[in-house]
Each structure stands twice: as structure tokens, then as C-alpha cells.
Amino acid sequence: MDASQLTRNLAGIVGEKYIITDPAKTEQYRQGYRFGEGRALAVVRPGTILEMWKILQACVEADVIVITQAANTGLTGGSTPDGNDYDRDIVIVNTMRMNIIQTINNNEQVVCLPGSTLNQLELLLKPLGREPHSVIGSSCIGASVLGGVCNNSGGALVQRGPAYTEMALFAQINEEGKLELVNHLGIDLGDTPEEILTNLQGHHYQRKDITQDAGKGHDHAYCDHVRQVDEPTAARFNADPARHYEASGCAGKLMVFAVRLDTFPQEKQTAVFYIGTNDINELTDIRRAALGEFESLPVSGEYIHRDAFD
């Protein structure tokens, strides 16, 4: 299939309004927040997860590279091409039109579609007396929920650790080289990809369809793991295999259509402390005491350079 045929097929899926091929108009999608830029055959903006699936089918058939992109706010790249030395054409699938969030299990969990943002989730949960795992992305409040899960974001979070779930709906190329949809959300949505995606998009399921013990909705062990201050390795580092599970930490190797996550009771009384010193060893002592000795862990913590502090 040639490039022009693929773009026609993609336009047939989403409509001419939601496919962009003009390089001047695709630049905002092809250029990263901090770094990374390259050519793309097209940017496609599906309005439903069924359209997203059909786009992926067409791209796999055409043997092009697919980059799934949400808010494009990441500081470490991965949401855009990086250079122009790829061996195939690239299609960017921007997910921000699909921003549905569904609360389940008495608001103790949520199901988030690819375009939902952390800020949107926080505002949804606040009147319910709940809060999400993370309340801000690495760079701004526009960061997506799924982007955080796919990249295990949340390095400053001490109590809850990196974004993580074992419950997701995703597509992968299997060992036979075939595209398949995998429903590990723990929600009975039907049998075919079309049924699963349509029923999820429309919230066409009931409480009886939800499996309660389908997997973890956050990293339950991190609060103990982070207290091990005498271990030879850091508790938190990029691409930690201990926090890779299907969609979690997949970093673009899967196309993720939805994740199921835990929510948390709102913190009633919190305070922010700024601690300044000219001796980095004092900060090390404070960190070791807070992690190793405090009865309650800090919600989050971050080192800030004196220039930023001032």
C-alpha cells in the first residue's frame, strides 16, 4: 500500500477534518515539548477508540511506524519522531479527542480513555472526596493519564510511587505477527474488538460485569520499597523492570485504549515545607530520616536547585 492510499484510508476512518498531512500544520504534533522532531506522513485524531483501532489496523497493514501521542507534554521524548532517519513512514495518532473518564466501584476506581488528563481527573474526583494517583504531569497540568502510566511517571511521589496498573485494554502484535486486542481491564465488554471498544466507549456495562480482583490499580508495595534507604540501588529510576506490566511502562510498544486505576481519599491536612541548605549532606540526612523513621511517609518530595528556589 502506498502512502497516498494509506492517507485516503485514514481519512475514510476519521473524516478529512481529523487527518493532517501539511507539514506546517503537523509541526505542533511532530515537535516535542523539550526535544525531538521529525517528519510524519500524517497526524490522525480519532474521536472514538474504535476509530483508533481501525487506524492501527490500517497502519499495520501498510507497515508504517505508529507513534501514539496524547498531550505531548513529556520531558523525556517518545511522543514525537526524533530525527528523519527512520526506515519507514510514520503516522502520529493523537488521542486527545477521546477524553472520557468513567468512575466505578463507588468512585474508588476509574477507567480512563487515552485523551483524559490528570487535571480533568482531579476535577472530576474532587467533589467525590477522592483524588487521583497523580495531580500534575512532569511539565504542566495538560499531561494525560495514560501517558503517565505508559511511562511510569510520578518520580516525586513518595507514598504512591510511579503510575502503575495491571488492568488495561491494549493492542499488540503477537508472536505470529498478527494484530490483536487484549482486554485485561477486568470488565466483561464482549468478545470482538468492535464489541469491546464500542461498549467501553459508551459505558455499556454494569457492576456485575466488573471483576473486583482483576489486578492492582497502583503499586501497593512502593511505600515499603521506598523506605529501604540502605539498598545499593535507588528506589526510583527510569525503565525500572519491577514496574513494567503490559501497559504500565510500555513506552509506546503497545497501543493502549484504556486503563483502570485506583483513586484515593483526599488528604485532609497537608503542608508544604521548603528546606534550604548549603550542605547537601544535610538534605541526605533529612531524606533518610523521612523515609526510614517517619511513621507517615511524605506525600511527595523533590530536590530543587537554588536558582529555581530563589
Describe the predicted segments one by one.
Residues 17-19, 41-43, 64-67, 89-92, ...:
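Structural motif
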Residues 1-61, 73-111, 137-138, 261, ...:
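N-terminal flexible segment immediately upstream of the FAD-binding catalytic core
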Residues 17-23, 69, 133-136, 284-310:
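Flexible, glycine/charged-enriched surface loops at secondary-structure junctions
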Residues 48, 73, 109, 116-121, ...:
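Short, structural beta-strand-to-alpha-helix junction motif
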Residues 60-61, 187, 262-264, 288-293:
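Short, solvent-exposed amphipathic alpha-helical segments in soluble enzyme
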Residues 6, 55, 121-124, 283-287:
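Hydrophobic side chains in well-ordered alpha-helices
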Residues 126-281:
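FAD-binding subdomain of flavoenzyme oxidoreductases
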